[in-house]
Amino acid sequence: LGDVYKRQENRLLASGNILLTPFPELKFKSTLTLDRRNAVNTTFLDPISTAWGRNQYGEASDNRNMNTVLTFDNVLTYNKNFKKHGLEVMAGSSWTDSDYSNSWINGSHYRSDQIQTLNAANKISWDNTGTGASQWGIMSFFGRVAYNFDSKYLVTANLRADGSSKLHPDHRWGVFPSFSAAWRISSEKFMENLTWIDDLKLRGGWGQTGNQSGIGDYAYLQRYNIGRIEWFKKGGEGDSTDYANAVPTLSLIHI
């Protein structure tokens, strides 16, 4: 049979929302989204036709992981136009929670290549079998005020606050403002004869942004690995041993 590699992944995407309009100028929208993935990866090297398989008398692995991401958004919007003035005010919140878990097991020493599941393995790997899990969350609050006069002169101000579980509790939150202004030149009277220009706008702005990409889920904490020994063979105790595998990232901890 040789090498057998199998991968199966299932994904569930679900979303629901509620839209409330107390009066024409005011709208409230609430949205809940679920994104769940389950993946299974299995391998089998038979004990006969492959060199590595013959060396291990057959080898198999089973790796599984599940990731669930929940997002809950709430947005309140107010729009009002009066004469040549236009005003939009928006405020909202966003919450995201991610839960990840995985497990892996490897076995060897098969009597034949007919049964490839791990329950037919006569030896389970001690150092290549285990489980893992991680979780992170982020909470955000945001708002925007936009004003325009005659659809020609526009100003916008934004403010956003984000709090991430990946950062130390003492400096977990960040506030990010932004401002912009625009002039729609094509709407001015002196542009009326320039029919070859449909829309011409001059815009400038300034803002700050933040992100948590590249930061580990527990980067500000001391982390440990758990090691196991075959105590029943060596005559030792059956206690697991733990040792540090990574120091916390200094820029993410409270000093």
Tell where the protein language model's regions lie, with residue ranges.
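Extracellular/periplasmic, surface-exposed regions of secreted and cell-surface proteins
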Residues: 1-45, 54-253
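Short amphipathic helix-turn modules centered on a small-residue break
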Residues: 47-49
